[in-house]
Amino acid sequence: MTALEMQLTELLEASVNASGYELVGLEFIRAGEHSTLRVFVDHENGINVEDCAEASRQISAVMDVEDPITVAYHLEVSSPGLERPLFKAAHYQQFVGHEVNLVLKMAMNNRRKWKGDIVAVEGELITLKVDGNDETFALSNISKANLIPKF
């Protein structure tokens, strides 16, 4: 997570939570003049389009007042979806036993992309079962992580 993404998470989390939703995480994607702030929200009873619209209004109001992003951007608010992104250690703990794709910031054993089942979470260390072996990753070295849906 970048410094800006951490700042935005701190800025938005209380407001989103006060509205009855969980701020799962967010991504800020810089793409020249077409930057996007993608915010993932959830609710204990699931989330629908109306919930996303309500959360979007709440987030927009905070962003308009605080104005933490200096470039033009589009706001997208959505559910985490089937390929749910994992941002926090608690997310990994919630999905122990599930298969995930990881992309690392810095390669480990000459690999940046990993796929395996979450077997343990200890503090900021995430352990996956990869090809029969346990591999442990520091949360701070994980650039992106998504659940792999089972059909």
Curated annotation (Swiss-Prot):
GO biological process, one term: ribosomal small subunit assembly
Matches recorded under Gene3D superfamilies: Ribosome maturation factor RimP, C-terminal domain, RimP-like superfamily, N-terminal
Any Gene Ontology CC annotation: cytosol
InterPro entries, per the entry: Ribosome_maturation_RimP, RimP_C, RimP_C_sf, RimP_N, RimP_N_sf
SUPFAM superfamilies xrefs: YhbC-like, C-terminal domain (SSF74942), YhbC-like, N-terminal domain (SSF75420)
Localization annotation: Cytoplasm
Function: Required for maturation of 30S ribosomal subunits.
Protein family per UniProt: Belongs to the RimP family.
Protein name in UniProt: Ribosome maturation factor RimP
Protein species of origin: Photobacterium profundum (strain SS9)
